[in-house]
């Protein structure tokens, strides 16, 4: 860019002025007065001549190296000629360029294959580059070479160029004596940047050195060259070296017209700033050939990005001398017929700038875009060479190198153009020569306005023969190749189109036109091969407005979309720049088309209208399908969750709603929709149709799907109706599949059955959900409340979730929901719950084991267990889901929430989008995921306990009169106490199963400590701790949930006692303890959740559930004691051995934040929560104290169990007692 700028400066003034500029630019170049002849130019820059001799000296090799670059000599020559106003100069430059081209061709292999020669050339070029920025522009090696040649002799120039711009060198050398002047100017201007600019990223080097380095890089030796020559590198000084020169070739053309180019560049500079002015001024005043050269120079030197384009553009806007320019160019072309194509290339560049240069700018978007947009003419670029370089900077050296296929210095290398990782040079070569890279380069140059890239392409185009070779050599230059073919051929064609579009015959006209008027054509690249349809492409644009036309080029994996308005096209491009568009999982490169302002081409295949109609009809079909699937969900998508899902699916594309939904449908959209739509019937029905068998019969499949869904569900149900969602997802899925909805007369599969159940859910959810949410809201801000709620749900569900978690969502939801539902909502459900509980226990035993196995895969185990429990807990699921509605989707919260507690909260607030994150939402509360896991653990631990304890709790709750949603579960627990033997018997099995679960829990607890915290802490612990430590429990669960580590530990530890309790016969007590927490939770249907959310629920729970907790705790201690006593039998195994062995933080809830973090059990203060909960709660001292505490609670619980209803007051006493003991 700097070179371009220097060139522009040189060119801007007239021949005479240019010398001044040259002098100015290059200290060593005292007023190279744009001599009439190329050589005249050569002499003008005194500094350049010295460098040329060195190049000559070292140029034997360099010349050979530059031989390749000579391929572009025509450009160089032509460009120099344009720089030189006189036709004679142009002819001379052409001749020189041809000679140099031949020489360079001879020497090309030498430099390309000879590192030493490349180095020498680099050195020479660096020296020359300093004096002749043009050469830098020309592409460090070539440019510098060219300047040398120009400065010195055309052969020398050629020789120097041979590094990179053989032709360019020749062009400069022969093209124009003036060339050196501009070259000098450029160097003095430190056009390194400019050089880079022309070459996109190479310019960063010092004015001269960078060019040289770049040149070498192109050759392969120069590091800078690598950046600039990335593409050149690909050509490796082959034809592409020339190709690199292709840009440099342009620059060579520029070099050739160095003086002119510089002049023009300068003009371009100012002119381009005022685009018309420069082109007019320069083009008009300067010989057109010169102007052309200038343009090329601007293009090449100006970064070949927008400079030439801008120059042309400027001229284009006032293409006054487009023909003249063309003519002038033609002399250049005379040297190389392709030179004219370069002119089209220039127009192409113009097009480039016009086409959102930013498109090209991705790598060098800034510079390109800025420049294209700034001046869209090399002039401006040059005028702001530095700036251009900077803007070009966006076009990193690496991007340039990648663009040009320069072999990476380090492997593995990620192609900055294609974002593809290449592990070895062979792969790199293949990649560079591949379609993807070519297309990306094309897109890159197009979108980035990479004149550099385009320049090379243009240069290639210009020196079609050389350029083509260059392009091919550049293999990497697939882009160039494409450009060459599409742009070389197309430039003429495209430009031709442009020409028609523009009055001027110059192909650049098109660009000018494009530039002049913002286009409404969007260029889409990197379409997935063979899997992209017109619909996919059009779908990308539909969200932004009407698509009026399109072109889908499957062979090149490109497409053009014509929007009705430029604003729509710009909005589309801007949007997809921020969020990559995806088709079939492949990222698309979407940029404003620089080639087309509108698509007047015949539409291939179907008409846009037909396709859009197809898309709309397809969307309707998809919507209907979704309606079937998630039909009600769709409307429900008005809910944040649905919105989340919808936007999420819409995110990729407007029409991808359905498609997005469809693909995720089974895993995300389906469950999301299912939970989204209150009408599960369509969703359930669809789900059943889709995978009833797999989900029902195949635990794994179900788990797989359920895993995703579980996460989503967890969040979503939370927002929607966890019960409903649970029902939908679990029940809908597994329960529905396994059991017709118990609640619904028809089978789950039947829509009516589904709806019946859903209706129940709707009815219930309002209750449970309302209660849950009301309580949650009362207790805490919605978000933390929901999180805590989820936690508490998990905690509450831990009992039910012992089996329920094993069941995934089913057992837990079934139990807690059943219990709560039975209690608060349906007495008959209590029976159902009991049956379900029995089923749950059995299923939980199985699921407990399964869950233990898959506990870590909480979603998986959820799915699997869900399946199991769904079969055995069909009613449980239904009841649980109903209860979930009542309890605010406890089960869902539990099983889903744990996975993504944060998500759930976010989902509640934000919508279903969070559902996606459901699993990832561990950050908000580590407890969240742990909750899920521990919930599973808890379910394993508490299946019996939950059932028996729930029965006990139900009794206790009945005594206590705490009958809420949790009451269903509590009542079940109450029943348990009545059947302590059976409960114990049942529990022992369950407990055995669950004890392993606990072990697994313990094992998982380290990872799931927080989970255990929320689950066990909220559930088991809360039950136990609530029994023993109602206030502590409330606070602890809050704190625990807030700080998951310790509560997790304690909860994890307590689950063991629960299990033990359940086993021993304290199951009723445990159940009572659980039931009480459930009661409390039940009191506030969400209280269970709230307790899980102890943090949130603490206020309310502490208030309403707190008292209850204390009474519960009164009982809970007994239960806990029973549990502890049993744990005392088993405790050594579970709490002590298991936890010690597993080093799981237990009793985390006992760590409460005070001055520091204080462990109430051990009376120890810690400054860090992590230290207290993670380290201390894993310590033997804490384990022992916790065991003692639990044993005490168990003893007290036994006593209290007898008077389970009254102990609540005692609970407070017990907790304080415990606290005292702790203290």
Swiss-Prot record:
What are the Phosphoserine sites (modified residues) in this protein?
637, 639, 642, 644, 662, 681, 744, 803, 861, 872, 887, 889, 973, 976, 1044, 1111, 1116, 1206
Zn finger spans (Matrin-type): 1157-1188
Q: Please tell me where this protein is predominantly located.
A: nucleus
Stretches for region Disordered = 1-59, 238-288, 306-381, 626-902, 971-995, 1042-1102, 1197-1223
GO MF entry, a single one: mRNA binding
Q: Which UniProt keywords apply?
A: Cytoplasm, Metal-binding, mRNA processing, mRNA splicing, Nucleus, Phosphoprotein, RNA-binding, Zinc, Zinc-finger
Instruction: List cellular component terms (GO).
Output: cytoplasmic ribonucleoprotein granule; nucleus
- Residues crossing the lipid bilayer are none
Report the protein name in the record: RNA-binding protein 20
Organism equals Sus scrofa
